[in-house]
Swiss-Prot record:
This is Malate dehydrogenase. NAD(+) binds at residues 11-17, 107, 114, 131-133. Catalyzes the reversible oxidation of malate to oxaloacetate. It catalyses: (S)-malate + NAD(+) = oxaloacetate + NADH + H(+). It comes from Xylella fastidiosa (strain Temecula1 / ATCC 700964). Belongs to the LDH/MDH superfamily. MDH type 2 family. Pfam families: Ldh_1_C (PF02866), Ldh_1_N (PF00056). The keyword Oxidoreductase applies. InterPro entries: L-lactate/malate_DH, Lactate/malate_DH_C, Lactate/malate_DH_N, Lactate_DH/Glyco_Ohase_4_C, Malate_DH_type2, NAD(P)-bd_dom_sf. The active site is at 189 (proton acceptor). Gene3D superfamilies: Lactate dehydrogenase/glycoside hydrolase, family 4, C-terminal (3.90.110.10), NAD(P)-binding Rossmann-like Domain (3.40.50.720). Transmembrane segments: none annotated. Its EC number is 1.1.1.37.
């Protein structure tokens, strides 16, 4: 058996948390030879804590061989103590009549506190994935609130958008998703993100040779991927939970265990690539090895793509400007 890993999960009794925890305990995130301790955080109210206790009871009843221990708490300092990985799933959802800027403010308070707690008690090499929306800006806030930790280790989840785009291409081409490579989702995890298959291949053949149809790209593919979350809410009455948890597993597994040369999409702090301001958490194509990621460099950006990338960048800059005064 490999060394034990401590995983903190916030919003642990929520829908995504419930879909996520059992799969982590089964070894799907860190490997089937890595015991885990789940450190679960929920809100400090009676109902949330009772629900979290119920989740813990169910985890116990699964008798997972890899589950070496559990912590349930409403205190971030306890949840993040010595964490090797932190999945920040819990966030304030948008309520009726709530403006986007109000949502940003409410979440800024949450992620400032969580970033500070990580800075105080987590392992110095902790790897952080923000799932709670608005994920990119929440990740930026947490990163800025943890000055003693490696900023490169704060990431946002765009893997759900990536997987949604993969599925749409698979359906269009009649090819298995496993045979499609080099897909990218640029930008913000929001309806402005830009799924880009200009470099993608299916069975090694460029997809743009099979789908040479800019109208389908602009009028069907991009809108379907960008509005998929809303379509699921409309159909199900609830937001994506199992698919979001699955994407979180994919993101962390590939980051920690390596993508084997394949391109994946991660929201990571920009190093200035593609004209994206340094430090902004932005969806890029990356490859991963030995627990570190590298942005795929020097891809040509055509006029069509630049329009979309500029739009998602403008949204992120606006979000960042609205919360900068709250950061230290």
């Amino acid at each position: 058996m490999k060394a034990l890993v401590r995983v903190a999960v916030t919003g642990a009794a929520g829908q995504i948390g419930y879909s996520l925890l059992f799969r982590i305990a089964a070894g799907e995130m860190f490997g089937k030879d890595r015991p885990v301790i789940l450190q679960m955080l929920e809100l400090p109210d009676e109902k949330a804590q009772a629900a979290l206790k119920g989740v813990m009871m169910e985890l116990e009843d699964c008798a997972f061989p890899l589950l070496a221990g559990m912590v349930v708490t409403d205190n971030p300092d306890i949840a993040f103590k010595d964490a090797d990985a932190a999945l920040l799933v819990g966030s304030r959802p948008r309520g009726p009549g709530m403006e986007r800027k109000d949502l940003l403010m409410e979440n800024a308070k949450i992620f400032t506190a969580q970033g500070a707690a990580l800075n105080k008690v987590a392992r110095r090499d902790v790897k952080v994935l923000v799932v709670g929306n608005p994920a990119n800006t929440n990740a930026y806030i947490a990163m800025k609130s943890a000055p003693d930790l490696n900023p490169k280790h704060f990431t946002a989840m765009l893997r759900l958008d990536h997987n949604r785009a993969l599925s749409q291409l698979s359906t269009k081409l009649g090819k298995p998703v496993a045979n499609i490579e080099k897909l990218i989702v640029w930008g913000n995890h929001s309806p402005t993100m830009y799924p880009d298959y200009r470099f993608a291949t299916a069975d090694g053949t460029p997809i743009i040779e099979a789908i040479n149809d800019q109208a389908w790209n602009a009028n069907s593919f991009i809108p379907t991927v960008s509005k998929r979350g809303a379509a699921i809410i409309e159909a199900r009455g609830l937001s994506s939970a199992a698919s979001a948890a699955n994407a979180a597993i994919d993101h962390m597994r590939d980051w920690l265990l390596g993508s084997n040369g394949k391109w994946i999409t991660m929201g990571v702090p920009s190093d200035g690539s593609y004209g994206i301001p340094e430090g902004m958490i932005f969806g890029f194509p990356v490859t991963t090895t030995n627990g570190e990621y590298s942005i795929v460099k020097d891809l040509p950006i055509d006029t069509f793509s630049k329009t979309y990338i500029d739009k998602t960048l403008a949204e992120l800059e606006e979000e960042r400007a609205s919360i900068t005064h709250l950061l230290r």
